[in-house]
């Protein structure tokens, strides 16, 4: 067991070091190049490959502005289609579904079940108490008939 702790500490330290090395990013100032009427900013971040879900998407063109019903429209170049970023409370491909907050109304059935459970529990305790008292009284009874002060005529 003593050997297990240093090994786990060693593994944890190596994992933290690996994460730190992956998270380290050097930032270089952008290079601006004038191309016609367009200004292009190039940085090292443009050359980094990332997951598709995190890639930048541009705002939709005017013909797609009404595509999203309850959200902001963005055009994803790799998917080559308009996607929606829904406002809070809406879901769906075009943010057309309202997310309803659901809650359950307390019904009387729940309270009836709790009442029956408590009643059965109390009844069980009473039966156990009755059996205990009866057994105790039977142990205390003497096998002889002892009168408590009354005398019967012979």
Swiss-Prot record:
Q: Which InterPro entries match?
A: EGF-like_dom
Q: Name one GO molecular function term.
A: growth factor activity
Give each disulfide bond as a residue pair: 60-73, 68-84, 86-95
- Record keywords, A-Z: Disulfide bond, EGF-like domain, Glycoprotein, Growth factor, Membrane, Secreted, Signal, Transmembrane, Transmembrane helix
Domain EGF-like: from-to ranges: 56-96
Q: Which residues lie on this side of the membrane: Cytoplasmic?
A: 132-154
Function, as annotated, reads: Promotes the growth of epithelial cells. May stimulate the phosphorylation of EGFR and mitogen-activated protein kinases.
This chain's protein is named Epigen
């Amino acid at each position: 067991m003593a050997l297990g702790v240093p090994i786990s500490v060693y593994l944890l330290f190596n994992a933290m070091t690996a994460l730190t090395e992956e998270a380290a990013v050097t930032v270089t100032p952008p290079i601006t190049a004038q191309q016609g009427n367009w200004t292009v900013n190039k940085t090292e971040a443009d050359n980094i490959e990332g997951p598709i879900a995190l890639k930048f998407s541009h705002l939709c063109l005017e013909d797609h502005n009404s595509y999203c019903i309850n959200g902001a429209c963005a055009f994803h170049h790799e998917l080559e289609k308009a996607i929606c970023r829904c406002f809070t409370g809406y879901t769906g491909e075009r943010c057309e579904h309202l997310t309803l907050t659901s809650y359950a109304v307390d019904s009387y059935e729940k309270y009836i079940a709790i009442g029956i459970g408590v009643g059965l529990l109390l009844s069980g305790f009473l039966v156990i108490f009755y059996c205990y008292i009866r057994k105790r009284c039977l142990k205390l009874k003497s096998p002889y008939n002892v009168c408590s002060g009354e005398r019967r005529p012979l």
